[in-house]
Protein backbone atom coordinates (compact mmCIF):
# COMPACT_ATOMS: atom_id res chain seq x y z
CA UNK A 1 0.00 0.00 0.00
CA UNK A 2 1.28 3.45 -0.84
CA UNK A 3 2.20 5.72 2.02
CA UNK A 4 -0.26 8.60 2.42
CA UNK A 5 1.58 11.45 4.13
CA UNK A 6 1.29 14.27 1.61
CA UNK A 7 -1.59 16.12 3.31
CA UNK A 8 -0.23 16.23 6.89
CA UNK A 9 3.25 17.05 5.62
CA UNK A 10 1.91 19.82 3.41
CA UNK A 11 -0.12 21.32 6.26
CA UNK A 12 2.82 21.17 8.64
CA UNK A 13 5.18 22.77 6.13
CA UNK A 14 2.71 25.49 5.25
CA UNK A 15 2.45 26.31 8.94
CA UNK A 16 6.22 26.38 9.29
CA UNK A 17 6.57 28.67 6.30
CA UNK A 18 4.10 31.11 7.84
CA UNK A 19 5.58 31.15 11.33
CA UNK A 20 9.23 30.65 10.30
CA UNK A 21 9.80 27.35 11.95
CA UNK A 22 8.80 25.40 15.03
CA UNK A 23 10.44 23.82 18.02
CA UNK A 24 13.82 22.32 17.22
CA UNK A 25 14.38 18.59 17.31
CA UNK A 26 16.21 17.42 20.39
CA UNK A 27 19.85 16.74 19.59
CA UNK A 28 22.28 15.26 22.06
CA UNK A 29 26.05 15.28 22.17
CA UNK A 30 27.68 12.04 21.03
CA UNK A 31 29.67 9.86 23.40
CA UNK A 32 33.32 10.81 23.76
CA UNK A 33 35.38 9.91 20.73
CA UNK A 34 32.39 9.23 18.47
CA UNK A 35 33.65 10.77 15.24
CA UNK A 36 33.50 8.80 12.00
CA UNK A 37 36.37 9.46 9.60
CA UNK A 38 35.80 10.04 5.91
CA UNK A 39 37.85 8.84 2.98
CA UNK A 40 38.42 12.30 1.50
CA UNK A 41 41.65 14.19 2.20
CA UNK A 42 39.60 17.37 1.97
CA UNK A 43 37.23 16.13 4.66
CA UNK A 44 40.14 14.99 6.80
CA UNK A 45 41.50 18.54 6.84
CA UNK A 46 38.10 19.91 7.84
CA UNK A 47 36.71 19.91 11.35
CA UNK A 48 34.21 17.21 12.31
CA UNK A 49 30.82 17.90 13.87
CA UNK A 50 28.38 15.21 14.99
CA UNK A 51 24.67 15.88 15.46
CA UNK A 52 22.27 13.28 16.85
CA UNK A 53 18.58 13.88 16.14
CA UNK A 54 16.10 12.32 18.53
CA UNK A 55 15.51 10.37 20.66
CA UNK A 56 12.91 8.35 18.76
CA UNK A 57 11.22 5.44 20.53
CA UNK A 58 9.95 3.00 17.90
CA UNK A 59 7.08 0.75 19.05
CA UNK A 60 7.69 -2.99 19.10
CA UNK A 61 6.60 -5.23 16.26
CA UNK A 62 3.26 -7.05 16.49
CA UNK A 63 1.53 -9.81 14.55
CA UNK A 64 0.38 -7.07 12.16
CA UNK A 65 3.92 -6.07 11.22
CA UNK A 66 6.93 -4.03 12.33
CA UNK A 67 6.66 -1.14 14.74
CA UNK A 68 7.07 2.19 13.02
CA UNK A 69 7.60 5.91 13.30
CA UNK A 70 6.14 6.95 9.98
CA UNK A 71 7.43 10.10 8.27
CA UNK A 72 7.79 12.19 11.40
CA UNK A 73 8.38 15.83 10.47
CA UNK A 74 10.51 18.07 12.68
CA UNK A 75 11.05 21.76 12.02
CA UNK A 76 14.04 24.01 12.69
CA UNK A 77 16.34 21.16 13.70
CA UNK A 78 19.94 21.57 14.78
CA UNK A 79 22.66 22.40 12.26
CA UNK A 80 26.34 21.52 12.71
CA UNK A 81 27.41 25.13 12.25
CA UNK A 82 25.97 28.60 11.68
CA UNK A 83 28.21 29.84 8.87
CA UNK A 84 30.25 27.21 7.05
CA UNK A 85 30.64 24.80 4.15
CA UNK A 86 29.79 21.12 4.59
CA UNK A 87 32.36 18.94 2.83
CA UNK A 88 30.75 15.58 3.62
CA UNK A 89 27.70 13.97 5.24
CA UNK A 90 27.94 10.54 6.92
CA UNK A 91 24.59 9.13 8.15
CA UNK A 92 23.90 6.47 10.78
CA UNK A 93 21.29 5.17 13.22
CA UNK A 94 22.51 4.60 16.78
CA UNK A 95 21.32 3.73 20.27
CA UNK A 96 21.83 6.03 23.23
CA UNK A 97 25.21 4.48 24.07
CA UNK A 98 26.49 5.15 20.54
CA UNK A 99 26.33 1.57 19.24
CA UNK A 100 24.87 1.11 15.76
CA UNK A 101 21.18 0.29 15.46
CA UNK A 102 20.85 -2.24 12.65
CA UNK A 103 18.49 -4.89 11.30
CA UNK A 104 20.41 -7.43 13.38
CA UNK A 105 19.20 -5.64 16.52
CA UNK A 106 15.72 -5.02 15.11
CA UNK A 107 16.04 -1.37 14.06
CA UNK A 108 15.82 -0.08 10.49
CA UNK A 109 16.47 3.39 9.12
CA UNK A 110 13.82 3.36 6.40
CA UNK A 111 14.78 6.90 5.43
CA UNK A 112 15.42 10.42 6.56
CA UNK A 113 15.53 13.64 4.53
CA UNK A 114 17.08 17.01 5.43
CA UNK A 115 15.75 20.19 3.82
CA UNK A 116 16.77 23.84 4.02
CA UNK A 117 13.47 25.66 4.56
CA UNK A 118 13.98 28.94 2.75
CA UNK A 119 15.94 27.67 -0.25
CA UNK A 120 14.19 26.74 -3.47
CA UNK A 121 14.31 23.04 -4.35
CA UNK A 122 15.74 22.46 -7.83
CA UNK A 123 13.11 19.97 -9.01
CA UNK A 124 10.06 20.52 -6.75
CA UNK A 125 10.29 24.25 -6.10
CA UNK A 126 6.93 24.92 -7.79
CA UNK A 127 5.13 22.05 -6.05
CA UNK A 128 3.65 21.75 -2.54
CA UNK A 129 6.69 19.67 -1.60
CA UNK A 130 8.73 22.81 -2.19
CA UNK A 131 7.46 24.01 1.19
CA UNK A 132 9.91 21.54 2.75
CA UNK A 133 12.71 23.59 1.23
CA UNK A 134 15.79 22.46 -0.65
CA UNK A 135 16.34 18.72 -0.16
CA UNK A 136 20.10 18.54 0.34
CA UNK A 137 20.80 15.17 1.98
CA UNK A 138 18.98 11.90 2.64
CA UNK A 139 19.66 8.30 3.54
CA UNK A 140 18.01 4.91 3.72
CA UNK A 141 19.24 1.95 5.74
CA UNK A 142 22.22 1.57 3.38
CA UNK A 143 23.58 4.77 5.03
CA UNK A 144 25.50 6.11 2.06
CA UNK A 145 27.91 8.96 2.79
CA UNK A 146 28.17 11.97 0.47
CA UNK A 147 31.75 13.23 0.19
CA UNK A 148 32.58 16.03 -2.22
CA UNK A 149 35.75 16.48 -4.29
CA UNK A 150 38.42 18.75 -2.85
CA UNK A 151 37.38 22.39 -2.87
CA UNK A 152 33.60 21.87 -3.05
CA UNK A 153 31.00 22.17 -0.27
CA UNK A 154 27.38 22.78 0.64
CA UNK A 155 26.96 26.31 2.03
CA UNK A 156 25.28 26.90 5.39
CA UNK A 157 24.35 30.47 6.32
CA UNK A 158 23.38 31.89 9.70
CA UNK A 159 19.77 32.50 8.65
CA UNK A 160 19.12 28.99 7.27
CA UNK A 161 16.51 26.79 8.93
CA UNK A 162 16.59 23.02 8.48
CA UNK A 163 13.70 20.55 8.47
CA UNK A 164 13.95 16.80 9.03
CA UNK A 165 11.66 13.97 7.89
CA UNK A 166 12.29 10.63 9.64
CA UNK A 167 10.85 7.15 8.96
CA UNK A 168 12.01 4.31 11.25
CA UNK A 169 11.03 0.65 11.69
CA UNK A 170 11.42 -1.90 14.49
CA UNK A 171 11.39 -5.63 13.73
CA UNK A 172 11.77 -6.70 17.38
CA UNK A 173 8.84 -7.13 19.80
CA UNK A 174 10.32 -4.64 22.27
CA UNK A 175 10.42 -0.86 21.75
CA UNK A 176 13.74 0.56 20.55
CA UNK A 177 14.99 4.07 21.33
CA UNK A 178 17.33 5.37 18.66
CA UNK A 179 18.94 8.52 17.27
CA UNK A 180 19.59 9.57 13.69
CA UNK A 181 23.25 10.51 13.68
CA UNK A 182 24.92 12.63 11.01
CA UNK A 183 28.67 13.29 10.98
CA UNK A 184 29.56 16.46 9.10
CA UNK A 185 32.99 17.54 7.86
CA UNK A 186 32.90 21.35 7.76
CA UNK A 187 35.07 24.28 6.70
CA UNK A 188 34.78 27.94 7.65
CA UNK A 189 32.76 30.18 5.35
CA UNK A 190 35.74 32.42 4.58
CA UNK A 191 37.77 29.57 3.09
CA UNK A 192 38.06 29.12 -0.66
CA UNK A 193 35.29 26.59 -1.32
CA UNK A 194 33.10 26.34 -4.41
CA UNK A 195 29.38 26.09 -3.51
CA UNK A 196 27.16 23.20 -4.57
CA UNK A 197 23.47 23.05 -5.44
CA UNK A 198 21.71 19.74 -4.64
CA UNK A 199 19.40 18.28 -7.29
CA UNK A 200 16.90 15.56 -6.32
CA UNK A 201 15.99 13.14 -9.13
CA UNK A 202 13.07 10.82 -8.37
CA UNK A 203 10.95 8.40 -10.41
CA UNK A 204 7.92 9.57 -8.37
CA UNK A 205 9.08 13.18 -8.33
CA UNK A 206 7.35 15.64 -5.99
CA UNK A 207 5.14 12.92 -4.49
CA UNK A 208 5.85 10.20 -1.89
CA UNK A 209 8.76 8.73 -3.92
CA UNK A 210 7.10 5.30 -4.24
CA UNK A 211 6.07 3.60 -7.47
CA UNK A 212 5.05 0.19 -8.78
CA UNK A 213 7.09 -2.43 -10.66
CA UNK A 214 6.13 -5.69 -12.38
CA UNK A 215 7.76 -9.05 -11.75
CA UNK A 216 11.05 -9.50 -13.58
CA UNK A 217 13.47 -6.89 -14.87
CA UNK A 218 12.13 -3.34 -15.16
CA UNK A 219 13.69 0.02 -16.08
CA UNK A 220 11.52 2.98 -15.06
CA UNK A 221 12.45 6.48 -16.25
CA UNK A 222 12.00 10.06 -15.12
CA UNK A 223 13.36 13.01 -17.13
CA UNK A 224 14.75 16.25 -15.74
CA UNK A 225 15.02 19.31 -17.96
CA UNK A 226 18.20 20.87 -16.62
CA UNK A 227 17.55 24.11 -14.75
CA UNK A 228 20.80 24.01 -12.73
CA UNK A 229 23.56 24.04 -15.36
CA UNK A 230 27.14 23.48 -14.31
CA UNK A 231 29.56 20.81 -13.14
CA UNK A 232 28.11 17.65 -11.58
CA UNK A 233 30.68 16.55 -8.96
CA UNK A 234 28.92 13.98 -6.75
CA UNK A 235 25.93 11.64 -7.11
CA UNK A 236 24.45 8.88 -4.96
CA UNK A 237 21.45 6.61 -5.39
CA UNK A 238 18.70 4.96 -3.35
CA UNK A 239 16.73 1.78 -4.13
CA UNK A 240 14.68 -0.80 -2.23
CA UNK A 241 15.04 -4.57 -2.05
CA UNK A 242 15.52 -6.32 -5.42
CA UNK A 243 16.93 -3.06 -6.79
CA UNK A 244 19.82 -3.50 -9.24
CA UNK A 245 21.05 -0.01 -9.99
CA UNK A 246 19.96 3.57 -10.55
CA UNK A 247 21.63 5.64 -13.26
CA UNK A 248 21.58 9.23 -14.56
CA UNK A 249 22.22 9.72 -18.29
CA UNK A 250 22.39 12.83 -20.47
CA UNK A 251 19.89 12.09 -23.24
CA UNK A 252 20.90 15.30 -25.03
CA UNK A 253 24.36 13.75 -25.47
CA UNK A 254 23.20 10.39 -26.78
CA UNK A 255 22.53 8.85 -23.37
CA UNK A 256 26.02 9.48 -21.97
CA UNK A 257 26.24 8.12 -18.42
CA UNK A 258 26.73 10.65 -15.63
CA UNK A 259 26.57 8.21 -12.71
CA UNK A 260 25.62 4.55 -12.28
CA UNK A 261 24.90 3.76 -8.62
CA UNK A 262 24.86 -0.02 -8.06
CA UNK A 263 23.11 -1.78 -5.17
CA UNK A 264 24.68 -4.47 -3.01
CA UNK A 265 21.84 -6.60 -1.63
CA UNK A 266 21.49 -8.93 1.33
CA UNK A 267 21.63 -12.67 0.65
CA UNK A 268 17.83 -12.85 0.42
CA UNK A 269 17.76 -9.80 -1.92
CA UNK A 270 15.22 -8.05 0.33
CA UNK A 271 17.50 -5.44 1.85
CA UNK A 272 19.94 -2.94 0.32
CA UNK A 273 23.23 -3.10 2.20
CA UNK A 274 25.08 -0.43 0.23
CA UNK A 275 24.95 1.76 -2.87
CA UNK A 276 27.99 2.80 -4.88
CA UNK A 277 28.58 6.53 -5.35
CA UNK A 278 30.14 8.70 -8.06
CA UNK A 279 32.56 11.57 -7.53
CA UNK A 280 34.66 13.59 -9.97
CA UNK A 281 35.81 17.10 -10.83
CA UNK A 282 33.64 16.94 -12.78
CA UNK A 283 31.63 13.80 -13.40
CA UNK A 284 29.90 15.70 -16.19
CA UNK A 285 29.02 19.19 -17.36
CA UNK A 286 25.32 19.80 -17.95
CA UNK A 287 23.76 22.72 -19.80
CA UNK A 288 20.42 24.46 -19.33
CA UNK A 289 17.62 22.78 -21.27
CA UNK A 290 19.37 19.43 -21.66
CA UNK A 291 17.49 16.27 -20.67
CA UNK A 292 18.94 14.17 -17.87
CA UNK A 293 17.18 10.81 -17.55
CA UNK A 294 16.91 8.84 -14.32
CA UNK A 295 16.84 5.04 -14.81
CA UNK A 296 15.63 2.93 -11.87
CA UNK A 297 16.28 -0.76 -12.53
CA UNK A 298 14.83 -3.66 -10.53
CA UNK A 299 14.81 -7.44 -10.89
CA UNK A 300 12.00 -8.62 -8.64
CA UNK A 301 10.45 -12.11 -8.40
CA UNK A 302 7.06 -10.50 -7.78
CA UNK A 303 5.23 -7.23 -8.46
CA UNK A 304 5.63 -4.48 -5.85
CA UNK A 305 3.93 -1.12 -5.32
CA UNK A 306 6.31 0.49 -2.83
CA UNK A 307 9.75 0.68 -4.42
CA UNK A 308 11.84 3.82 -4.86
CA UNK A 309 14.29 5.10 -7.45
CA UNK A 310 16.15 8.23 -6.36
CA UNK A 311 19.44 9.95 -7.13
CA UNK A 312 20.80 13.01 -5.35
CA UNK A 313 23.29 15.03 -7.36
CA UNK A 314 25.44 18.00 -6.39
CA UNK A 315 26.14 20.64 -9.04
CA UNK A 316 28.56 23.58 -8.99
CA UNK A 317 26.42 26.12 -10.88
CA UNK A 318 27.86 27.63 -14.04
Predicted regions and their residues:
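Secretory targeting and sorting signals
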Residues: 1-29
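Beta-strand-centric surfaces of beta-sandwich/beta-rich domains
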Residues: 33-231, 236-318
Amino acid sequence: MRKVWALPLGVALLTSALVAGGPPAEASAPPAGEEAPTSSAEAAAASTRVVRYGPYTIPGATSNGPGRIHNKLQLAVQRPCLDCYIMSFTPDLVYGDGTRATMATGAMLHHFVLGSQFRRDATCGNDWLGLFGERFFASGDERTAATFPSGYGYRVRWYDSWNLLVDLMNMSPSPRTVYVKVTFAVRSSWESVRPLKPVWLDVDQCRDSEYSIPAGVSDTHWDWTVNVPGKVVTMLGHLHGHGVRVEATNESLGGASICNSVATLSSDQHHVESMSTCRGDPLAVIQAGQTVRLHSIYNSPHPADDVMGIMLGYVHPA
